[in-house]
């Protein structure tokens, strides 16, 4: 029996995570938040004082990637991320850990180490995977491929609201600069750069609500699954 796969790719702050969780809940599919994998690995390497010395400690970093124990659960259209059984959902969502993830993602050997971990999420009845290279590198066979984007300014505004909701005091100018820096790094990296798959359904969410984007996605996915 074929496992249905839905991929959602796009830049940081475009709403991928929220919409991936909603789609997984809607269809009763498993969920993969690939960005969380990189954030978790980045945080782990930081704690081990390896993140700033990736080249000389590469074998140890690769082993850490292979051994990561992570689980994703969906609850009320939200994602709960467990690391070694501990809920780290909020911990890994800071801008600092996002920078850790971007550094990890730029290392080909670490991307390779996480490749099979991501492929292992293919399980019946289906999978919703969100990230930056889900359709182009990890799940090219996906039946439904979505590329979700938004202007850097609108993504910065959303991120500020999210962080303020977590009780953090942040400046939109700092968040915008961070987003623009990550976009540049993600788009220019040599391995699996951020770009839409040639057959992806592209959505710009700059002026759309979550519910409006979700409905567009469901309409598209229903057609792909029926086909």
UniProtKB/Swiss-Prot annotation:
Keywords: ATP-binding, Cytoplasm, Kinase, Nucleotide-binding, Transferase. ATP binds at residues 10-18. The gene is cmk. One of its GO terms (molecular function) is dCMP kinase activity. It catalyses: CMP + ATP = CDP + ADP; dCMP + ATP = dCDP + ADP. Belongs to the cytidylate kinase family. Type 1 subfamily. This is Cytidylate kinase. It is an enzyme of class 2 (transferase). One of its GO terms (cellular component) is cytosol. It comes from the Bacteria. It is found in: Cytoplasm. PANTHER family: CYTIDYLATE KINASE, CYTIDYLATE KINASE/PANTOATE-BETA-ALANINE LIGASE.
